[in-house]
Amino acid sequence: MAKIIRIKGEILGKDEPMVFTKEYNVVKEDDALETMYSEMGSKHSVKRAYINVLEVSEISEEDVQSPILKKTLEMY
């Protein structure tokens, strides 16, 4: 069964860390982490060592904040 995982973290940069929150609908928590590392590294040209994960939590459908994920969940 799929879970909704919220990942909070920061990307270390030259000036201040960039804080982010990402939400994924995945089967395993590890899949969410791998997808997040891949997306953030690709978009921001940063290596995984510069991405700090601060919190990983499973959330309910009602707690989803991402508009794209909300629309996806409404389709099912």
UniProtKB/Swiss-Prot annotation:
Q: Which InterPro entries match?
A: Ribosomal_eL20, Ribosomal_eL20_dom
Q: Which UniProt keywords apply?
A: Ribonucleoprotein, Ribosomal protein, RNA-binding, rRNA-binding
Q: Which GO terms describe its cellular component?
A: ribonucleoprotein complex; ribosome
Tell me which domain of life the UniProt entry assigns to the organism this sequence originates from: Archaea
Q: Which GO terms describe its molecular function?
A: large ribosomal subunit rRNA binding; structural constituent of ribosome
Q: Where are the transmembrane segments?
A: none
Q: What is this protein called?
A: Large ribosomal subunit protein eL20
Q: Tell me what gene encodes this.
A: rpl18a
